[in-house]
Amino acid sequence: IFLITDYLRTRDQMEFTPEPDMFHDIFGHLPYLTLDFYARIEDKFAPAYKKATQEEREVIKRLAWYSTEFGLVMEDNRIRVFGAGIISGRAELANTIMEFYRLSRDTVIDYSGDVFAQLQEHFDKNREDISRIIAGVKELHQKGEMSSQDQGWNVVRALYDKLGISREGYFGGEVILAPFDVEMIAQIPKTVYAFNPMFFVCESFEQMDALLDSYLKPIAERSS
């Protein structure tokens, strides 16, 4: 049994829906759930969530958000959309695809080389600025300044200016692509009502499995 919402986005919400709807559930999640690997990933969260502390539950929600909802995975040296939230949102999907193109156009990533290794290199080199951006996004959430589609990237761009981070090179697109990092994901809030400022990329399906297990499995295996 797969439970879905009874809400359907309006015509003027085709670019971006502020909450999950029937289209998201049926077009986004349902096809993925026919894939054994995706279904096994989805099954990891509930057992851990049941035994987790409140603080751990917040991390688990974010891990689910940035994997099965807004995850990206490398396959054949190309970045593939894995998250149901990306695939069912026209604007989110367009932002992601355009970022793949922009990284090449701006010579940030050379797609003839090892793409994930280059992404990891940019991430490591800019980790301090990424941490500052995440802290800033967290503060914006707490102030309620990322609660709508219009606020999303407008306030993030203003944040870049405030932090003195130039919107070029690795930071020049509509979204930041970063290697899947549990510690980093634990810090960034879920961006439900506005565009996501960051997506996380796994080197492989096996790596996603291992990284999620590294956090979820010890919690799920706790004695009751």
Report the location of each language-model feature:
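Core of folded catalytic or high-affinity ligand/protein-binding domains
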Residues: I1-S224
